[in-house]
Amino acid sequence: MKALILAAGIGKRLKVSLPKILLRIGNRSLLERHYDNLLSLGVKKIGIVVGYKSQYLIKCIKEIDKKKKIKIIKNPKYKLGSIVSLVSASSFFYERGELILMDGDVLYDKKILKKLIDTKKKDTLLIDKHFESGEEPVKVCIKNNKIYDFGKNVDNNFDFQGESVGFFKFSRDAAFMLLNESKKIMKNNKNAMYEDAIQKIIKDKKFL
């Protein structure tokens, strides 16, 4: 199993001067938490897409990666949509095993990541059912026990709704489906988000 962490973006809302993944909570950064959690749960390879002030993030990666498990992927066009970061990591999709896709700026309990990794379901995601609705959250709409819609702007016809945590688990086939859909969308819109590709695939009922 491999994990891809998207950490190239600028923290506009948080107004931080460093990459968001370097935020320290207590005595550890988000980066350190991701690294320790993923390795302890059996992930063999970690890809991290870097962009904004990447020199600081790369320095920190080299300091913590004693086991040489991290592949650094550079996205010089980090000011564009997150879909560019995902496509920048195209070669990482060929690494062996299922793919865990993660937003780098999430603070979480290790138990929820374990639940995602341990599930027998091939293609799945984590949601938070307790959230404040609005324009910003990426919403997951469930209807008849299936994901009906996904994105910031969604159809209102659903049984219940949650917010995407930004953590996904994809089989190898589904991961390449996501990559290919992302490439198609990026040709016409480099400001798109990777969630747009997931939404398109869900709408086409291809997975999840």
Segments and roles (model prediction):
Residues R96-L107:
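Short beta-strand-to-loop acidic/aromatic patch adjacent to the donor-nucleotide binding site
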Residues Q199-L208:
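Catalytic donor-sugar/metal-binding loop of nucleotide-sugar-dependent glycosyltransferases
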Residues D109-K187:
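Conserved core of the sugar-phosphate nucleotidyltransferase
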Residues A7, V50, D103, I127-D128:
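Short beta-strand/turn micro-motifs composed of small residues
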Residues K2, R28-E98, N188:
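Conserved N-terminal catalytic core of the sugar/cofactor nucleotidyltransferase
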Residues M1-V16:
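N-terminal nucleotide-binding beta1-loop-alpha1 segment
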Residues M186-Y194:
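Short, charged, surface-exposed loops that flank catalytic or proteolytic processing sites
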